[in-house]
Amino acid sequence: MPDAPKSNSESLKKLYSDMLLIRRFEERAGQLYGMGLIGGFCHLYIGQEAVVVGLMGAAQEGDQQITAYRDHGHMLAMGIDPKAVMAELTGRSTGLSRGKGGSMHMFSSEKKFYGGHGIVGAQVPLGTGLAFANKYRGNKNVCLTYFGDGAANQGQVYESFNMAELWKLPVIYVIENNQYAMLSLIHI
């Protein structure tokens, strides 16, 4: 986890700095993608920076994160080196997954980041499993499990909610409503 700030003023500056880092990183990634220097897909996190930065500000050492394919911002907020993330995006061997995972499939066991996942909602049961492992091991860690509004209607998401409630698992489900999903209405 990133180092905790010492004062409220310092804390606010750190939050702003982290959000700005994510925004500028994503803007550059978008440029490189447009130039054809990033292969495959590149799902940007622009406009959602405050979600992960705010939650990381409350996270404790050892807490895990798992998310979908908009994962660059999560890694940066966890303190993963931006050069390693960019190296992965551009397919270099110095990337987090040795240049093989690209935008959607990065991973850092050292930072407890268990990846971005390309299948909508697939990370939710995995995050629930990480929470089960925390409970089984008796540690005090939680798993922050992020998903978008489009994944909110997937069956495995509701099954995960049910298991988490039945077993009182240490998981926080974070729905990032970026309004990209075509069939997830927030107004009637």
Each predicted region: which residue ranges?
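Active-site flanking residues adjacent to catalytic metal/cofactor-binding acidic residues
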Residues: G148, I175-E176
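N-terminal glycine-rich anion-binding loops that anchor highly charged ligand groups
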Residues: L20-Y33
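Short gly/pro/ser/thr-enriched loop/turn and capping motifs at secondary-structure boundaries
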Residues: G73, Q179-M182
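Conserved small/polar residues in nucleotide/adenosyl-binding loops
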Residues: I186-I188
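Cofactor-binding active-site loop characterized by glycine-rich and histidine/acidic residues
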Residues: E27, M35-W167
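A glycine-rich helix N-cap at a beta->alpha junction
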Residues: W167-V174
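Charged, compositionally biased N-terminal leader segments and the immediate start
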Residues: M1-K13
